[in-house]
Amino acid sequence: MNDWSIEAARAGYNVTHWSQGFYGISDEGEVTVSPDPKNPDHKIGLNELAKDMVKAGVALPVLVRFPQILHHRVNSLCQAFDQAIQKYEYQADYLLVYPIKVNQQKTVVEEILASQASKEVPQLGLEAGSKPELMAVLAMAQKASSVIVCNGYKDNEYIRLALIGEKLGHKVYIVLEKLSELKMVLAESKRLGVKPRLGLRARLAFQGKGKWQASGGEKSKFGLSAAQILTVVDQLKQSDMLDSLQLLHFHLGSQIANIRDIRQGVSEAARFYCELRELGASINCFDVGGGLAVDYDGTRSQSNNSMNYGLSEYANNIVNVLTDICNEYEQPMPRIISESGRHLTAHHAVLITDVIGTEAYQVEDIQPPEEESPQLLHNMWQSWTELSGRADQRALIEIYHDSQSDLQEAQSLFALGQLSLAERAWAEQANLRVCHEVQGLLSTKNRYHRPIIDELNEKLADKFFVNFSLFQSLPDAWGIDQVFPVLPLSGLDKAPERRAVMLDITCDSDGIVDQYVDGQGIETTLPVPAWSAESPYLIGFFMVGAYQEILGDMHNLFGDTNSAVVSIEENGMTNIESVLAGDTVADVLRYVNLDAVDFMRTYEELVNQHIAEDERAQILEELQVGLKGYTYLEDFS
């Protein structure tokens, strides 16, 4: 690829669009991060950052967090709504509520809350969906009358804790998901002497499109039907507590790619709000829930991994619809709340790790088959000679298909005992040579060639064995086919010599990344610089800050990775603020009720029985170190 350039690299990996300006490729071909938007020229080279961490004793893989990205995401979303409110002369304000289920890590929650520390009136609250999350939120929420939204299924204890939150000075909205929860709230509030702030989750008829669309619509797991909502209103009237009903909540589903879906859902919910106001409810908060998407592939489309709108358009549509419908009903405009956790956290974290080895197809020269060889092999030789002699390009596809068919026949004949192992190996090499030659002759400009180019890219791709667990660090890539941008961290100033797929180190064939951002689309392989065992080859998995840590599992007992918090100072210096060690072998054994202390006793007994006395101390030390060691691979020498 003689026309390769840095611009070609940036376009090929589509960095400009999925990164939102936080990540880029330098003129030297290094992947960089610019976490502070106030100083876009202050960049950190991720390759050098990782090497510095390794020198400091932080083993790969390491999850790197950039808190300044969190700050920017919070403030940019609040700014978008503030501008929309001003544009449409909306008569209420906006509040951003962070649902901690997206990422409950202490550093993440604290940095989100700190992002508006300088504001006289912060526009931030927190959301909890379970008792453990509520306990965390009650302690971590900002002290001055902070808003807490309580979602999820509830028992009496959950409700009591939420009401205690009111006693502690918070504004706690208990969102009713089921009709039966109202009775519990009324009883517990009476016992505690606390007037509750109630919310309703409406089950809309409209259902957004996407992987999480089941969380919206009439068949959704959560929410109250129109009839159930009216029952709640009647029961509150009978209890003389209708003024406790202060919030309307709905949720269209996570990662809503199409802005028209958001607009339509908000329109339906706005009519719920106005109708409830006309029934006498004192609702003054309109909680649109989640749904604000993240453009994982950078295509700015309606695909499940993208979004066809920006922040301003998102805020404008919500504010515009609410303004129009409230004016139509002559009802006051409510405070707008959104629970946009994915948008806040996805970009801030990147997993950096190393390629520990590769496996590439070796295309070898072949000699013509022996005269007495089966006719099938002679046919394959003829296909190769026609191709290597540069046959008419119109015949390329035909030759390729013939070679594929011949290979399948050769494998079948071998299974029937009619072809020797050597003859099968020759057939496979002949097919490989044809594939390799055809790949170089096909043109992406020819639409008939494109499917075969994709097929050959996948067939001939190198296998990169990468030091991580897909199930621990990118569970959504395995579970729901989520796309995450993947990039080699250096060498991008040179044309990629290979295409590769990334395989993890678990003993599971599902441990493979099979979708990659490539230009304006998704491919099954990734263009990469050639791998060399002589120097570290680092890979970055981007946009893993939302859901991945808490959803990750311990398949093969690979545990949490090391992590670090990194920022850029005003003077441009890199600051590694904190490093947290990942799980040790003993840690993950403890998760499955296996005791490292018991293991050491067993090891000692076995060593005394089977190991010579002069070796015992060394062997026991190795076993002890193994239990204290990182669960990922560290020693390749």
From Swiss-Prot:
InterPro entries xrefs: Ala_racemase/Decarboxylase_C (IPR009006), Arg_decarb_HB (IPR040634), Arg_decarbox_C (IPR041128), Arg_decrbxlase (IPR002985), De-COase2_N (IPR022644), Orn/DAP/Arg_de-COase (IPR000183), PLP-binding_barrel (IPR029066)
Binding residues for substrate: 286-296
Superkingdom, taxonomy of origin: Bacteria
Role this protein plays: Catalyzes the biosynthesis of agmatine from arginine.
Protein's name according to its UniProt entry: Biosynthetic arginine decarboxylase
Catalytic reaction equation(s): L-arginine + H(+) = agmatine + CO2
Cofactors, names only: Mg(2+); pyridoxal 5'-phosphate
Entry EC no(s): 4.1.1.19
HAMAP family in alphabetical order: SpeA
Residues recorded as bearing N6-(pyridoxal phosphate)lysine in the entry: 101
Keyword Ubl conjugation: no
GO MF entries: arginine decarboxylase activity; metal ion binding
Classification via NCBIfam families: PRK05354.1, speA
Pfam families the record matches: Arg_decarb_HB (PF17810), Arg_decarbox_C (PF17944), Orn_Arg_deC_N (PF02784)
Organism annotation: Shewanella oneidensis (strain ATCC 700550 / JCM 31522 / CIP 106686 / LMG 19005 / NCIMB 14063 / MR-1)
GO biological process, one term: arginine catabolic process
Keywords: Decarboxylase, Lyase, Magnesium, Metal-binding, Polyamine biosynthesis, Pyridoxal phosphate, Spermidine biosynthesis
